[in-house]
């Protein structure tokens, strides 16, 4: 059984990681020195003599000889290499754009309906704190040595089996998200054009063709397109926050000053049901809200996927991490705080949206707008929802293809998915991801909104499992740095709290993963569909990890044996070159005066 499986992939099976040599064998066994073309040396401007890279065809098993084959980042030849065309502004906007979608615009309505305003605010704030620590840990690793996705970090710093598990768990998540977003887009359009007039499959096809075209032409165009699309989303969110603030103060047409009225009546917390009341009922509702807060934040960790295509990642990744954290505070916490003040959890309009489609009619923002007496904005808002869904689907398809590519590069998926086009697009991985988008046609039915909620459950679990893995990998990475005496003060970015913050976030991420759907046990009838969709990610993750470990007999890499140096010199040099370019840019900005470029760098660059 082993041989056919091994032949499918680019690498032979990893061996036990009991030394630095065996760790290199385990993680880089797929890298054949003869596969690297000489022109790779020119592309990365590497002085082979200076870096002691003298023989790529050496058959020596010593670390130095084997390291010679790793002079080119990622060990990829011209046909399996991504293009480093993403700037810091692209990375941060792709990350925030991938998470600003239906989860925030529409999912907040279900969260408010489930737990009440304060329960929703606390849940979003707490999950936001976990996201902050997770992003910080990811940022430290990604800015030290950027690798291709989570699977590469897990395989290199912990265990190849963990890399396999998170790689496929994350892949399944992003096989599900694009078709689900396409379904949501078709449902949004039904706000204007009913399914009786135009079959939703028509809209799905149109959106799919456009999104595939954007992903095919290369990451530079994709990054620029997504930057402007996400910038529009940022502007919309800022506008909505301002509008909610005005409505709360009584600035709407009805001039009704709301203040904290709905926190008092009907209350800050909602009881779960008539059977579970009082403090117990409110606590149950509070815990139930975590499902929706998780879904709203999912995708914000995309920085770890796109950093391998980043220009000067040691500068761009930390900046993207910091900007993402600021946006969490503004977009998520300000939004849910103001929503809880403008809409009561027992509002008739909000109650009437329960179980409805993902159009503007199901959004708490529209409820707040309509309650204030504004008539025309719901149609404009629905158009904004459509843009949000389109952008999220665009990012999701990108991540799906890049994650499959990373698995292939790491030797954990068929090598055919590692091939890239002349624009640096992993076209075979993209084709398979597009094929899964066909699931969207199955979702277009009268019960599609219910199916969407089931997918929310699945994606939420896959999302938090990816956060758990990032935190585990960081803990091992930090332990290896301390064991090998690496001074973190010289890092481009260091996570606040470091391992203590990681342990804190890991504990609560695991706790939330275990209890997030416990409400299925509280009703009179066991909701097996919600239970299965809510927890199916756990057995998938565990079976993937255990199966790979049993087949390939891998072991957790010792802290003293973890490879913390391969590719480091290349990124050190790239960082130095980037610093020189930044100095030239600063001098140019000073000489040119305060023009638009200066204005963007100093002000707009901190927003977009």
From Swiss-Prot:
Q: Which UniProt keywords apply?
A: Amino-acid transport, Isopeptide bond, Membrane, Phosphoprotein, Transmembrane, Transmembrane helix, Transport, Ubl conjugation
Q: Which GO terms describe its biological process?
A: amino acid transmembrane transport; amino acid transport
| GO molecular function list | amino acid transmembrane transporter activity; dicarboxylic acid transmembrane transporter activity
* Segments traversing the membrane: 91-111, 120-142, 157-177, 202-222, 232-252, 286-306, 323-343, 373-393, 424-444, 455-475, 502-522, 531-551
Q: Which Pfam families match?
A: AA_permease (PF00324)
> Which intervals of the chain are annotated as region Disordered?
1-77
Q: Where is the composition biased (Polar residues)?
A: 9-20
User: What is its biological role?
Assistant: Can transport glutamate, aspartate, glutamine, asparagine, serine, alanine and glycine.
* Record's protein name: Dicarboxylic amino acid permease
Which stretches are Cytoplasmic in the membrane topology? 1-90, 143-156, 223-231, 307-322, 394-423, 476-501, 552-608
What is the source species? Saccharomyces cerevisiae (strain ATCC 204508 / S288c)
Q: Where exactly is the Glycyl lysine isopeptide (Lys-Gly) (interchain with G-Cter in ubiquitin) cross-link placed along the chain?
A: 76
Basic and acidic residues: compositionally biased ranges: 65-77
Stored InterPro entries: AA-permease/SLC12A_dom, Amino_acid_permease_CS, Amino_acid_permease_fungi, APC_YAT
Cellular component annotations (GO), alphabetically ordered: cell periphery; fungal-type vacuole; fungal-type vacuole membrane; membrane; plasma membrane
- Low complexity bias (residue ranges): 54-64
Residues with PTM Phosphoserine: 22
Say which domain of life the source belongs to: Eukaryota
Q: How does it sit in the membrane?
A: Multi-pass membrane protein
Q: Where in the cell is it found?
A: Membrane
Q: Which residues lie on this side of the membrane: Extracellular?
A: 112-119, 178-201, 253-285, 344-372, 445-454, 523-530
């Amino acid at each position: 059984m082993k041989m056919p499986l091994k032949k499918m992939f680019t690498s032979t099976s990893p061996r036990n990681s009991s030394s630095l040599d065996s760790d290199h064998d385990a993680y880089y066994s797929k890298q054949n020195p003869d596969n690297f073309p000489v022109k790779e040396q020119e592309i990365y401007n590497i002085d082979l003599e200076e870096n002691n890279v003298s023989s790529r065809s050496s058959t020596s098993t010593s670390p130095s000889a084997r390291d010679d084959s790793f002079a080119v980042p990622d060990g990829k030849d011209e046909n399996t290499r991504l293009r480093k065309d993403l700037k810091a502004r692209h990375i941060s906007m792709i990350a925030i754009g991938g998470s600003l979608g239906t989860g925030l615009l529409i999912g907040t309505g279900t969260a408010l309906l489930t737990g009440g305003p304060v329960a929703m605010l606390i849940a979003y704030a707490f999950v936001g704190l976990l996201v902050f620590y997770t992003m910080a840990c990811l940022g430290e690793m990604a800015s030290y040595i950027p690798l291709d996705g989570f699977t590469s970090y897990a395989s290199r710093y912990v265990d190849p089996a963990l890399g396999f598990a998170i790689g496929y768990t994350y892949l399944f998540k992003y096989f599900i998200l694009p078709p689900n977003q396409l379904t949501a887009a078709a449902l949004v359009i039904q706000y204007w054009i009913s399914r009786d007039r135009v079959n939703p499959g028509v809209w799905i096809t149109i959106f799919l063709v456009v999104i595939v075209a954007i992903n095919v032409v290369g990451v530079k165009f994709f990054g620029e397109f997504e930057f402007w699309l996400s910038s529009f989303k940022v502007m919309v969110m800022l506008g909505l926050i301002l509008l909610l603030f005005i409505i709360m103060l009584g600035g709407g047409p009805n001039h009704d000053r709301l203040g904290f009225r709905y926190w008092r009546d009907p209350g800050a917390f909602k009881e779960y049901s008539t059977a579970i009341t009082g403090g117990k009922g409110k606590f149950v509702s509070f815990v139930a809200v975590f499902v929706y807060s998780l879904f709203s934040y999912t995708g914000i960790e995309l920085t770890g996927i796109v950093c391998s295509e980043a220009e000067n990642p040691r500068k761009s990744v930390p900046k993207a991490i910091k900007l993402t954290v600021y946006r969490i505070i503004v977009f998520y916490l300000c939004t849910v705080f103001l929503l809880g003040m403008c809409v009561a959890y027992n509002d008739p309009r909000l109650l009437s949206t329960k179980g409805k489609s993902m159009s503007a009619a199901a959004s708490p923002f529209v409820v707040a707008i309509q309650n204030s007496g504004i008539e025309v904005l719901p149609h404009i808002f629905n158009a904004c929802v459509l843009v949000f869904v389109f952008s999220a689907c665009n990012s999701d398809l990108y991540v799906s293809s890049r994650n499959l590519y990373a698995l292939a590069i790491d030797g954990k998926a068929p090598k055919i998915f590692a091939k890239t086009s002349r624009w640096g697009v992993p076209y075979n991985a993209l084709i398979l991801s597009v094929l899964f988008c066909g699931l969207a046609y199955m979702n277009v039915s009268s019960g599609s909104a219910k199916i969407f909620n089931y997918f929310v459950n699945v994606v939420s679990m896959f999302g938090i499992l990816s956060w758990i893995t990032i935190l585990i990998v960081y803990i091992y990475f930090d332990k290896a740095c301390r064991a090998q005496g690496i001074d973190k003060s010289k890092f481009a970015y260091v996570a606040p709290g470091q391992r203590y913050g990681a342990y804190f976030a890991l504990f609560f991420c695991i706790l939330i993963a275990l209890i997030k759907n416990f409400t299925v046990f509280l009703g009179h009838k066991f909701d097996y569909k919600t239970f299965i969709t809510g927890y199916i990610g756990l057995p998938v993750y565990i079976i993937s990890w255990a199966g790979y470990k049993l087949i390939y007999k891998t072991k957790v890499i010792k802290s003293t044996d973890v490879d913390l140096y391969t590719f480091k010199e290349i990124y050190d040099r790239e960082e130095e070159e980037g610093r020189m370019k930044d100095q030239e840019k600063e001098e140019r900005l000073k000489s040119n005066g305060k023009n638009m470029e200066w204005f963007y760098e100093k002000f707009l660059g901190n927003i977009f």
